[in-house]
Amino acid sequence: MLLRFTKMHGLGNDFMVLDLVSQHAHIQPKHAKQWGDRHTGIGFDQLLIVEAPNNPEVDFRYRIFNADGSEVEQCGNGARCFARFVLDKRLTAKKRIRVETKSGIIVLDVQNDGQVSVDMGPPRFIPAEIPFVADAQALSYPLEVDGQLHSIAAVSMGNPHAVLRVDDVRTAPVHELGPKIENHPRFPQRVNAGFIQVIDRHRANLRVWERGAGETQACGTGACAAAVAAISQGWMDSPVSLDLPGGRLHIEWAGPGKPVLMTGPAVRVYEGQVRL
């Protein structure tokens, strides 16, 4: 059978989006791995699946697969594309959309200028909820990699993140250190690794090594986690503008227990069909 799909991106973080509300198919990890290959498939960072909800309090169910076939809990840039997609496909007429993910409910607001704001909910810092192996909760933790200690913040935005402060993201060892942090035994479900360079109280540069995808042009949950870490440690104040390789995201966070609000673009690239 042929499935219709849409290729989209949020600041270069690119997605294949499937509507399984009006189409019916059983998508497996092997399909994400096959389609995600940039040489022999469609090529993407993540596969986003739109499903009808089981929960009557939400509008849609949102599933995410990495290009390596692993299913993950959350994707912030994908959430913005999800909102744009369901409106463009007339699956809803709402501009405020409630969506159920593996990690909980998020709220998407589509603005008149095409930007999309995502209420990501409050960040989680308790190590067991990230999950992260630590004796007690702290603002920062020493993490040993190849005999060297690195100071990291550990936070969950529905998915796990480690955040490191660096002097210059251009020379940060993202491709060397990123995969080692991703697969560190203290992160039992692996982790996304963010490298943040603080410019001033409201601006920073960021690169993210994503779990199961490698370095991407942008990572929405990574931007949220980096902003939360920077504000928590007193490096920055809300609101925060983060410049990633693919462009800029705006993050607002009022403090512990409060939701993180992320705003940025969502772009449709092309429509296609793929054989299942």
Curated annotation (Swiss-Prot):
Q: Cytoplasm: present as a keyword of the record? A: yes
Q: Which PROSITE patterns match?
A: DAP_EPIMERASE
**Phosphoprotein among the record's keywords?**
no
Catalytic residues at: C75, C219
| Enzyme Commission number | 5.1.1.7
Q: Which GO terms describe its cellular component?
A: cytosol
Where are its TM segments located? none
Instruction: Name the Gene3D superfamilies on file.
Output: Diaminopimelate Epimerase, Chain A, domain 1
Q: Where is this site: Could be important to modulate the pK values of the two catalytic cysteine residues?
A: H161, E210
Q: Which residues are tagged with the site Important for dimerization?
A: Y270
Top-level division of the source organism's lineage? Bacteria
Task: Sum up the protein's function in the record's words.
Answer: Catalyzes the stereoinversion of LL-2,6-diaminopimelate (L,L-DAP) to meso-diaminopimelate (meso-DAP), a precursor of L-lysine and an essential component of the bacterial peptidoglycan.
Quick one: a GO biological-process term for this protein?
A: lysine biosynthetic process via diaminopimelate
The entry sums up its family as follows: Belongs to the diaminopimelate epimerase family.
Any idea what this protein is called?
A: Diaminopimelate epimerase
Compartmental location: Cytoplasm
Q: Which Pfam families match?
A: DAP_epimerase
Note the PANTHER family from the entry.
Answer: DIAMINOPIMELATE EPIMERASE (PTHR31689:SF0), DIAMINOPIMELATE EPIMERASE, CHLOROPLASTIC (PTHR31689)
> What keywords does the record list, in alphabetical order?
Amino-acid biosynthesis, Cytoplasm, Isomerase, Lysine biosynthesis
What the entry lists under HAMAP family is as follows: DAP_epimerase
Q: Name one GO molecular function term.
A: diaminopimelate epimerase activity
Annotated gene: dapF
- InterPro entries annotated for this entry? DAP_epimerase_AS, DAP_epimerase_DapF
Query: Chief localization class?
Result: cytoplasm
Q: Which SUPFAM superfamilies match?
A: Diaminopimelate epimerase-like
- Residues binding substrate, per UniProt: N13, Q46, N66, G76, N77, N159, N192, E210, R211, G220, T221
Pathway listed: Amino-acid biosynthesis; L-lysine biosynthesis via DAP pathway; DL-2,6-diaminopimelate from LL-2,6-diaminopimelate: step 1/1
